[in-house]
Amino acid sequence: MPNSIFQSCHQKDLKSLFSSAYKDIGAQKKQIKQRFQDIVHEISAAFLSRKYSIDKILLTYNKYIDPLLRCSCPTFDSISVIAVGGYGRKERTLYSDIDLLFLAQNDQLLNNQRLFEYIDVLQSLPVRIGYCTHNFDSLITYANNDVHLLTALIDARFICGSDAGMVYLKKILHNKKNLPCFHDFFIRKCQEQKARDYKYPMSGVPDIKNTVGNLRYLHTLYWLFKFMFPKNTINRVLQQKYISQPEFNRLKNAHCLFSEIRFYLYIYYQRQENRLLLDGQQAVINFFSADSGRPIESFMYRYHKTTQEVSRINYAIIARLANSVNLPKP
């Protein structure tokens, strides 16, 4: 992969840059914004070259965003900075939100001027910074009442600061103590999927993230399996026959296709845009069809067939899971 930018983004170099500018918040904002834009430019060029898989593109992109957050972060002895959501999964695309959890043992530790300044610096990035702050007790309380927060925690990944919060979070996710049981989590995620289907129906302008049979259908299965088996997820679900190897392979291929389309849309619009708008459809078709040498109709047929396959497999797996917890088929 082209590395002219990435070589300049090693953590050691960034640490030196930010430590010298630390007292000047304005300079720090300028530096982190420029570094971010450099990385976006370079990873976009790498994607457009069609030399690398989308998995490698996403992993590399997130790999080089992490040091920006670490090196612009002051030393926190008692606050954990944790990536959640798509950023936690290392699937964050170009202009997607950067979602963070700031976790400490109590609220007094979170009432920290350096934390406020750090958040202010991050908000200078040309993407939305979604964040929440919690102490250990409030995290459990909110996770029990908010399925969106609970789901985001499944994707949690340590970035910097104190590791105590991450150790605590891993422990509660593993033993499920004081968290909803799988039965309740399963019902909530099925209800969430139905509500999303109603909000984003099939249309001539599909949403790559939310429309029926697209990325969220894949994410829902991932979250259900990850909640059930925090460790060795894929091996366990294959062994338990919740999913077959051919089904898994189809879902993996679908994830690659949807992620590629989504990544290209973000480049094309230079913003967060998950909808296949009419002008975007033509651009996507031209880009992917030119590479494959296939006619335009072939690409769209592949896309729609893939959404149908994902829907079918999603429904089949949810039915199997429902049976395992003695629930009627949703």
Set out the residue ranges of the language-model regions:
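Helix-loop-helix transmembrane hairpins and adjacent membrane-interface loops
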Residues: 74, 106-108, 116, 170-173, ...
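Extended catalytic-interface subdomain
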Residues: 163-180
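Active-site nucleotide-donor binding segment shared across nucleotidyl transfer reactions
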Residues: 56, 65-112
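A glycine-rich phosphate-binding loop feature that marks nucleotide/adenosyl-phosphate handling sites
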Residues: 133-142, 278-283, 327-330
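Glycine-rich, histidine-containing beta strand-loop boundary motifs that form or position
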Residues: 83-85, 96, 102-105, 126, ...
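Conserved nucleotidyltransferase catalytic core and NTase-mimicking acidic/glycine-rich helix/loop elements
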Residues: 2-3, 178-325
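Conserved catalytic core of two-metal-ion nucleotidyltransferases
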Residues: 63-66, 70, 112-167, 188, ...
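N-terminal regions immediately upstream of nucleotidyltransferase
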Residues: 1-77, 95, 199
